Amino acid sequence: MAIKHLFTSESVSEGHPDKIADQISDAVLDAIFEQDPKARVACETYVKTGMVMVGGEITTSAWVDIEEITRQTVREIGYVHSDMGFDANSCAVLNTIGKQSPDINQGVDKADPKEQGAGDQGIMFGYATNETEVLMPAPITYAHRLMQRQAEVRKNGTLPWLRPDAKSQVTFQYDQGKIVGIDAVVLSTQHSDSISTADLREAVMEEIIKPVLPAEWLSKETKYFINPTGRFVIGGPMGDCGLTGRKIIVDTYGGAARHGGGAFSGKDPSKVDRSAAYAARYVAKNIVAAGMADRCEIQLSYAIGVADPTSIMVETFGTEKVSQEIIIEAVRQFFDLRPYGLQEMLNLLQPIYKKTAAYGHFGREEFPWEATDKAALLRDFAGLK
């Protein structure tokens, strides 16, 4: 690893057009799962000025009101008036949902549920590092926290002129792999026409940036770029169209780990793009929590209709405290990475997905794949004290 280097990650707010789409897709999934946890769902959403189109393939015994789910999701995000460029109450909602292909279904559903095949081929990665308390890379962790704070002060009235669309980016300085400071912070937020650029920049610094970023990492050399274009009134779906699955690096590790390319939102857990990526994070996090390595990346791969992974790779970047052979054997013994096994292991057949669709799928303790309940087992297995 370079002795000194910079690393940057970005996040986007719940009001970013792509995140609106992700949240609608996952809200549909959750609504269906409340009635039918065995449903097959692949829900895609497109948003643009004045309209939302929801499509995809869904096979279920449930009935859900797609239009009302869509409007309620947009409402909760905060687009409730045409002044913002998008209004949950008046936008058009188009529904183009069909059923899952029986050709796919025959490869997934088996007489013995434990032999459930993967819903598609693909590669998935999971990652963990001990540089933060949530075992996530610091740049993406703090980029998300800035966006969560933006939503908080927007919704609680502290900064009532804020609007839902926003982005953040944080550049960390590292020395021999350890954080030594924050080099740069970028935060752009949509706002009403009533606020001056100078007042906005001061308020964002005092109410969003300073409460979130640890003071010991900030210095006179830290650079701040707050609404660097000077004006951000037109935003949300009026500024850009949004699509489900277009923020896959924001959703995962901010570029600090590899990505298999598959998006998460709108997909039920039979889609290994989602469920196996969650399982890979769970494995990597437990390895790091057990003290077996400081950093760990897991790769899984699958073939459509086949239960067992076609490959499992463990990479610890030279930070392992026990041999690679012990780590690999521990993964084999303590983690069932077949589609049915990982659904059961992580209790994935429940309506928990809308919450994942903004501010990252990882590093948030409320999700089952963030548990470190196998760490003690792994420690004992590896002979670590």
UniProtKB/Swiss-Prot annotation:
Residues 100-110 are annotated as: Flexible loop. Its cofactor is Mg(2+); K(+). Pfam families: S-AdoMet_synt_C, S-AdoMet_synt_M, S-AdoMet_synt_N. GO terms for cellular component: cytoplasm. SUPFAM superfamilies: S-adenosylmethionine synthetase. L-methionine binds at E57, Q100, D240, K271. Its main location: cytoplasm. It comes from the Bacteria. Pathway: Amino-acid biosynthesis; S-adenosyl-L-methionine biosynthesis; S-adenosyl-L-methionine from L-methionine: step 1/1. It is found in: Cytoplasm. Coiled coil: none annotated. HAMAP family: S_AdoMet_synth1. Catalyzes the formation of S-adenosylmethionine (AdoMet) from methionine and ATP. The overall synthetic reaction is composed of two sequential steps, AdoMet formation and the subsequent tripolyphosphate hydrolysis which occurs prior to release of AdoMet from the enzyme. This is S-adenosylmethionine synthase. It comes from Vibrio cholerae serotype O1 (strain ATCC 39541 / Classical Ogawa 395 / O395). The lineage of its organism: Bacteria, Pseudomonadati, Pseudomonadota, Gammaproteobacteria, Vibrionales.
